[in-house]
């Protein structure tokens, strides 16, 4: 046993974590009227609240949607995909319906499968959210693991992430192609969005866990998505030992996020996500939710000050700097877009973009 190996049956063992006995849909609790606040990470909630509170930032995003339009965006995402239904990908459809029921989502959002070996999924849209599932994910994961991924994406929808995630995807594509409006200002917005985007993944990991109600399933899915191996080739307990190494230093997680900013990564490392999710479980919040102790949809939402207060314990200075950078970059980006539009209209024979 190495210094990171968990003792058998101890707190680091997946078998000992709360909720382990809830594997399999027959025994899962339906979380009636559960509010997304139940699973949202304080840093994600505060950052998103801050983004929504900056009018110029939201204006920039909606102007981009005005330029491209929601329908063309939907078609672009769905052009090479198949919509899931009882007759198309019936296995995926059945698993998805169970997730919708467990999380008591208001409705089943359109779900598509796209042919690509890359193991991934995403939730996109503006007023009409939809979920896109890569075929590589469908092939790699077993039923429970796939339900974790589906619940994760439903969590993004219910938390109101899809508008910003869609804009993130568009801006990344524009940046890669050197589109005229994507200069330093837009890249500043990208950095700010990336910071929130990664925090939002931590929230949806919690939603994914609530959708399957078995930590072992989540850790196994993350392990497969990190390494691509089969159950015979990998061992969950050793993967958890990797995650334990990330908890040896209080400052390491923040350092990892800073490195990811430099690398331009959209997702935190899976080992870091395992560590974050285990920390949340150990607070008792997960068990309380399964006992029915959670905020309901329709309950009064906490105020802005309270939202910031939750995050301030570990995130206050970082969040303040984050919002300031977003506000400054968004103003510059707005001016850049408007100037580009004016230049397009002023050119003879050109009707704008």
Name each model-derived stretch.
Residues 53-72, 167-193, 250-264:
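Alpha-helical membrane-targeting segments
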Residues 96, 133, 152, 204, ...:
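Divalent metal-coordination and catalytic microenvironments
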Residues 154-173:
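Catalytic Zn2+-binding segment of zinc metalloproteases
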Residues 141, 150-159, 203, 207:
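Active-site His/Glu-centered metal-binding helix of metallohydrolases
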Residues 224-265, 276-307:
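Extracytoplasmic and endomembrane cell-envelope/extracellular-matrix remodeling and assembly machinery
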Residues 1-127, 287-291, 295-353:
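Hydrophobic or amphipathic, alpha-helical segments that drive membrane association/targeting
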Residues 87-93, 99, 103-105, 182-249, ...:
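Short helix/loop segments within enzyme catalytic domains
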Residues 83-87, 91, 132-148, 192-198:
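Short pre-active-site segment immediately N-terminal to the catalytic Zn-binding motif
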């Amino acid at each position: 046993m190495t210094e990171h190996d968990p003792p058998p049956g101890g707190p680091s063992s997946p078998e000992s974590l709360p909720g382990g006995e809830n594997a399999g849909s027959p025994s899962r609790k339906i979380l009636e009227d559960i509010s997304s606040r139940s699973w949202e990470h304080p840093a994600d909630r505060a950052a998103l609240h801050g983004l929504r509170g900056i009018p110029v930032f939201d204006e920039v995003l909606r102007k981009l949607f005005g330029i491209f339009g929601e329908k063309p965006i939907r078609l672009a995402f769905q052009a090479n995909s198949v919509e899931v239904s009882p007759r198309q990908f019936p296995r995926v459809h059945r698993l998805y319906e169970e997730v919708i029921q467990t999380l008591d989502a208001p409705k089943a959002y359109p779900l598509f499968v796209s042919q690509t070996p890359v193991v991934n999924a995403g939730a996109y849209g503006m007023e009409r959210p939809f979920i896109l599932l890569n075929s590589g994910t469908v092939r790699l994961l077993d039923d429970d693991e796939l339900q974790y991924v589906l619940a994760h994406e439903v969590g993004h929808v219910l938390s109101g992430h899809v508008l910003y995630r869609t804009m993130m995807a568009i801006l990344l594509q524009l940046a890669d192609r050197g589109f005229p409006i994507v200069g330093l200002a837009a890249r500043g917005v990208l950095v700010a969005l990336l910071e929130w985007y990664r925090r939002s993944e931590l929230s949806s990991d919690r939603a994914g866990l609530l959708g399957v109600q078995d930590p072992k399933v989540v850790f196994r899915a993350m392990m497969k998505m990190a390494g691509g191996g089969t159950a015979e080739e990998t061992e969950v307990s050793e993967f958890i030992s990797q995650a334990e190494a990330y908890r040896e230093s209080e400052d390491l997680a923040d350092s990892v996020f800073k490195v990811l900013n430099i690398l331009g990564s959209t997702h935190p490392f899976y080992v870091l996500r395992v560590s974050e999710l285990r920390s949340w479980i150990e607070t008792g919040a997960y068990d309380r939710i399964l006992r029915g102790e959670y905020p309901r949809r329709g309950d009064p939402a906490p105020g802005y000050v309270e939202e910031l207060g939750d995050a301030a314990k570990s995130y206050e200075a970082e969040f303040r700097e984050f919002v300031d950078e977003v506000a400054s970059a968004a103003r510059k980006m707005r001016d850049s877009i408007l100037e580009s539009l004016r230049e397009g209209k002023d050119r003879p024979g050109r009707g704008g973009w």
